[in-house]
Amino acid sequence: MLITRTPETAQEWEQYYQLRYTVLREPWGQLKGSEVLQDEDQSDHAMVIDSETNEIVGVARMQTNTPTQGQVRCVAVAPHVQGRGVGKLLMQYLENLAQQKGIKEIILDARENAVKFYLSIGYEIFEDSYLLFGEIQHWKMRKDFNAAF
C-alpha cells in the first residue's frame, strides 16, 4: 500500500533527500549535498512510502511564492515505480495542501521527459524555461485551480 505524507523522522528525511539526489542529481555528476536547497525549512514536503517495504518511492516539495501562488520543485520518483501513479499521488497531495492554504495557482519547471505527465494531470505549458546541466530542457508549466475545477 502506498501512503503519501510529510517525512517525520530523521531517517525518513535522510531517505527523502537520498532519493532526490539519486534521481535528480547523481546521474549528471552533481555533488552529494546539492539536492538540499537553502529554503527547505520554508517549503512543504511530500513523500510516498510503500508501507509493505517501508521504502520511500517518491518525493516532492512546494514553496509558497505569493499568498496565491505555489511552486512545486524537486519531484523525484524511484525508477522502478515510475509510471505507476506515484507522481500523481505526490501532486494530488501538494495540490490539496495548496488549496487548503488558499493558493490559486501552482507553477513548476518540468524536465522535458516529464512534460507529458504534467499535461495529463491538468498543467499547461506557458513558456520555455532553462537548460539544466547544459542538456536537460525545462518548460514552465502551471495549473490554475480556478480554471481546473
Where are the regions a protein language model picked out?
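Anionic, Ser/Thr-rich low-complexity intrinsically disordered regions
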Residues: 1-121, 126-145, 149
